[in-house]
Amino acid sequence: MAKVSTTVESSIAVPRAAFYTWLVPGVFSNQLETVLRDAASLPGVKSTAGTTGPWDVPGSTRIVNLTDGTNCRETVQQATTPDYFAYRLTEFSSPPVAGLVKEAGGQWWFTDEAGGTHAKWTYTAESKTDFGIVLLTPIIRILWHQYMTEALERIKARAEAEVKGGSR
């Protein structure tokens, strides 16, 4: 079926290797709820459970519990330190999401730039039906884009404050 994507990007004043290590096996592994909060009428992450392995190892899975009481399964697809991280979301318990979305996923690219790291995050959702993409497109391109923007702003602020070599 059809897919819809959105991308956010940011310059982060932290060296790439240090930022990747702080984010992927760090924040993404055990502090996801600190950066993926309620935003743009969408639920945030409440907790994660049942993690099967380190969060920078492909094949590791977990259940992501959301603040609205729903959840989904997340699987690490690829992790290439310090350049790239990809994950896949399936088994959505929310009836509206489960009715619309076959699967979704995110890709993160990290590149060196003057003064730190350029982070690029693309999120893609695959619709279960041709009609579903009509409903899914504005949700992803407007609401989810805003959600991602706010999350990346929190990630940037925290990384620059917490990681050695950051600008603050």
Each predicted region: which residue ranges?
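Glycine-rich portal/gate segments that line the openings of hydrophobic small-molecule binding cavities
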Residues: 30, 41-99, 150, 154-158, ...
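Beta-strand/loop substructures that line and gate deep hydrophobic ligand-binding cavities in soluble
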Residues: 89, 93-149, 166-167
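Hydrophobic/aromatic beta-strand elements that line small-molecule binding cavities or substrate pockets
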Residues: 8-10, 72-78, 103-112
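Short, glycine/acidic-rich beta->alpha junctions
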Residues: 4, 68, 102
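A generic structural signal for beta-strand entry/edge sites
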Residues: 3, 82-84, 114-118
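Hydrophobic ligand-binding cavity/cleft-lining segments
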Residues: 1-54
